[in-house]
């Protein structure tokens, strides 16, 4: 028996040695721009600390050349790693890209205790572009409203600048809400009245065009012709930024939006959230480059969950239940496994782990975990954000996703809709940043 046990032990040792040699000879797995690092339990680890990754990326962007009064990335969506426009993609998403960019840069400015004035300077540049260069004409149903799409390096955008899936004279109401909210935050930081004036203009235009929603249409359509208000796509899934805009303006002394906030929250609570458990038809349409009208997306439910987690009982005592329903809807429809990590895609028609949506997923799950004390999503949040950050190169230049090695691309995915998410996850669990 002793002899047999010794043989088994020798056999196991030989097997382990062979497996070690095979592993050593196999090429290392690459995620994004780096060799993947896993711990003994198979959990994806950061390629560098989150703090270091953040500083590398911010340094790379703060070195971006300034032309026509703006850092180049402010005026284009498809930027190469040479800080230049990708020649085959002149299309541009000013409100989403620069609105989320302002939010990211203001949050980072607070993170560094306001020690680098260039960060605020770049946030102001994004705000200035929205206010000065990206408005509809002062006529029609959506006058002087920030454009959802346009053309790179135009100063200002022409009246017929609609691009991607927008028609030439179309805007997206929810993107105006994103821009308006960001401009209100920028006013709060700088006290520059032009940012407040545009935030108020966007909000007032939204209120003027608000309609009664039901089970087939939301209080605003997804797209409208700004000249006559003709809708295209009756459902706009991203309503949380209208709530944010109205609330922030109220906090800044403009109380005219309280009724609109109340009516909108009542619609979300009574119609949109219950729709998660049925067809999901009120969670379709968000991304500027799509016009498929039954295309559910992850961005809108995750950002509503973020808002509820931030507000907690101040908005509704059922905030935990609602937030979990929004996260579970996202997990059900948009997640898949890449390299052993549960990642989140954007929409029914695109499940790739783009930087904007994956960092949103990681941040919101981290915030929920910290706010509730639940461990259910905590590990998923950590690995999702780790995966996302593998897209950042050693020099700080990010790619648009970590699915394969790449540098540059969609600036919203590379950078502007990512930094604020990383900071939110770091605030939820500071130990993850070290």
Task: Give the label of every model feature segment.
Residues 3-14:
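Bacterial N-terminal signal peptides that target proteins for export
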Residues 13-22:
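Bacterial N-terminal signal peptides
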Residues 28-97, 118-163, 201, 205, ...:
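Low-complexity, Ser/Thr/Pro/Gly-enriched N-terminal "stalk/linker" regions
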Residues 32-39, 90-110, 162-164, 168-188, ...:
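Well-ordered alpha-helical segments within folded domains of soluble proteins
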Residues 60-70, 136, 190, 204-209, ...:
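Non-catalytic carbohydrate-binding regions of carbohydrate-active enzymes
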Residues 77-88, 153-166, 220-228, 281-289, ...:
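Short glycine/proline-rich turn/loop motifs
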Residues 192-271:
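Solenoidal tandem-repeat scaffolds enriched in leucines and small polar residues
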């Amino acid at each position: 028996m002793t002899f047999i046990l010794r043989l088994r032990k020798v056999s196991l040792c030989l097997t382990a040695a062979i497996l070690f040699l095979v592993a050593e000879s196999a090429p290392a797995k690459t995620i994004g721009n780096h060799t993947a690092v896993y711990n003994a339990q198979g959990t994806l680890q950061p390629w560098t600390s989150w703090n270091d990754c953040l500083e590398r990326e911010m340094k790379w962007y703060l070195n971006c050349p300034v032309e026509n009064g703006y850092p180049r990335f402010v005026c284009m969506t498809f930027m190469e790693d040479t800080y230049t426009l990708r020649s085959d993609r002149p299309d541009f998403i000013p409100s989403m890209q620069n609105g989320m960019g302002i939010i990211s840069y203001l949050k980072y400015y607070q993170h560094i205790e306001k020690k680098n004035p260039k960060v605020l300077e770049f946030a102001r540049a994004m705000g200035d572009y929205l206010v000065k260069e990206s408005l509809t004409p002062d006529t029609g149903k959506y006058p002087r409203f920030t454009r959802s799409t346009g053309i790179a390096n135009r100063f200002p955008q022409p009246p017929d600048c609609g691009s991607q899936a927008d028609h030439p004279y179309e805007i997206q109401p929810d993107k105006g809400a994103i821009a308006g909210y960001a401009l209100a935050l920028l006013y709060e930081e700088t006290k520059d009245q032009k940012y407040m004036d545009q935030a108020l203009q966007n909000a007032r235009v939204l209120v003027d065009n608000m309609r009664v929603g039901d089970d087939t249409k939301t209080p605003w359509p997804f797209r409208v012709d700004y000249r006559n208000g003709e809708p295209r796509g009756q459902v706009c899934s991203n309503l949380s930024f209208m709530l944010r805009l109205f609330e922030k303006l109220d906090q800044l002394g403009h109380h005219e939006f309280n009724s609109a906030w109340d009516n909108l929250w009542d619609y979300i609570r009574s119609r949109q959230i219950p729709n998660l458990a049925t067809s999901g038809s009120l969670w379709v349409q968000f991304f500027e480059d799509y016009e498929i009208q039954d295309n559910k997306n992850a961005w809108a439910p995750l950002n509503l969950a973020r808002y509820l987690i931030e507000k907690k009982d101040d908005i509704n005592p059922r905030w935990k239940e609602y937030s979990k329903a929004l996260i579970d809807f996202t997990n059900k429809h948009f997640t898949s496994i890449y390299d052993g990590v549960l990642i989140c895609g954007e929409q029914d028609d695109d499940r790739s782990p783009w930087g904007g949506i994956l960092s949103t997923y990681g941040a919101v799950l981290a915030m929920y975990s910290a706010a509730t004390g639940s461990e259910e999503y905590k590990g998923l949040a950590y690995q999702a954000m780790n995966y996302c950050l593998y897209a950042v190169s050693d020099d700080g230049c990010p790619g648009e996703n970590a699915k394969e090695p790449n540098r540059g691309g969609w600036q919203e995915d590379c950078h502007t809709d990512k930094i604020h998410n990383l900071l939110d996850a770091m605030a939820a669990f500071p130990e993850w940043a070290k």
